[in-house]
């Protein structure tokens, strides 16, 4: 099972770095920062489906 450590998040701003992750909501997030901010917003209901685009 793929996992991402989001303990340092949320962050006020994310870089434009493109390292896509696919969330359990079937949405592609541009990078870990964008994904982790969404995880925090979802109160932990959002999880990582896999690395790479959905």
Curated annotation (Swiss-Prot):
List keywords of the entry alphabetically.
Disulfide bond, Glycoprotein, Protease inhibitor, Repeat, Secreted, Serine protease inhibitor
Q: List the disulfide bonds.
A: 6-36, 14-33, 22-54
Q: Domain of life here?
A: Eukaryota
A molecular function (GO) term: serine-type endopeptidase inhibitor activity
Q: Name one Pfam family in it.
A: Kazal_1
Q: Which InterPro entries match?
A: Bifunctional_prot_inhibitor, Kazal_dom, Kazal_dom_sf, Prot_inh_Kazal-m
Question: Where in the cell is the protein located?
Answer: Secreted
**For the Kazal-like domain, which residue ranges apply?**
4-54
Q: Which GO terms describe its cellular component?
A: extracellular region
* Glycosylation sites noted in the Swiss-Prot or TrEMBL record: 43
CDD domains found in the cross-reference section: KAZAL_FS
Matching entries from SUPFAM superfamilies are given as: Kazal-type serine protease inhibitors
Q: Where is this site: Reactive bond 3?
A: 16-17
Entry's PROSITE patterns?
KAZAL_1 (PS00282), KAZAL_2 (PS51465)
The family database entries (Gene3D superfamilies) matched by this protein are listed as:
3.30.60.30
Domain remarks: Avian ovomucoid consists of three homologous, tandem Kazal family inhibitory domains.
What is the protein's name according to its record?
Answer: Ovomucoid
């Amino acid at each position: 099972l793929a996992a991402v450590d989001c303990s340092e998040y949320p962050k006020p701003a994310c870089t434009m770095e493109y390292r896509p992750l696919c969330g359990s909501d079937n949405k592609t997030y541009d990078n870990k920062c964008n994904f982790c901010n969404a995880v925090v917003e979802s109160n932990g209901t959002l999880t990582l489906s896999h690395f790479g685009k959905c």
